[in-house]
Structures are given as C-alpha cells and as structure tokens.
C-alpha cells in the first residue's frame, strides 16, 4: 500500500526550506484543510488551484507529484 501524497510530501519538510518543494511541504503541513488522504492528481490539483495561495506556481506541485509517482505509485 502506498502513502497518500500529503504523507509523502511531509518527508520534504525543513525548518528553513532549501527549495520550493520544501516550502510547499511546510505550507501543506500548516494547511488544516489540505486533503491529507488524497492520492489522485485531479483532486489535489483542483484543491491547490482553487483553495490555496501559498504555491508560487502549479509547477511546484507538478514536480512534487512526479516524484510521488516515481517513488510511491511506481508509474
């Protein structure tokens, strides 16, 4: 069984983020409405596009999603 995207993303959290994915992980951690159990691209991208303002660009999510697919979903 694979981790949800949120739980996968948490491995990138850093007190002082070194990159955009670490900053994204920190913001997602602080976002109490983040869909923590979601593992579908459409659900997550819709939430991020419509409900948050902490991502500088959706390309940050796309990069994190590609890593998630490779590591967890083995696509």
Language-model features: where?
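Generic structural signal for hydrophobic core residues of well-folded globular domains
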Residues: 12-13, 28-32, 47-51, 64-68
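A short, compositionally biased N-terminal segment around positions ~18-40 that is enriched
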Residues: 20-37
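N-terminal acidic leader/helix
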Residues: 1-24
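Short, charged early-sequence alpha-helical segments and their helix-coil boundaries
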Residues: 37-66
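Short acidic alpha-helix initiation/capping motifs at coil-to-helix transition points
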Residues: 1-2, 35-39
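Alpha-helix boundary/capping and short turn/kink residues
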Residues: 14-18, 34, 54
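Short acidic DE-rich linear segments
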Residues: 71-75
């Amino acid at each position: 069984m694979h981790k949800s995207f949120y739980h996968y993303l948490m491995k990138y959290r850093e007190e002082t983020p070194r990159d955009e994915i670490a900053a994204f992980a920190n913001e997602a951690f602080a976002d109490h409405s983040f869909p923590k159990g979601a593992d579908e691209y459409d659900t997550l991208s819709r939430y991020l596009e419509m409900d948050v303002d902490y991502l500088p660009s959706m390309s940050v999510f796309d990069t994190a999603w590609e890593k998630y697919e490779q590591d967890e979903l083995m696509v």
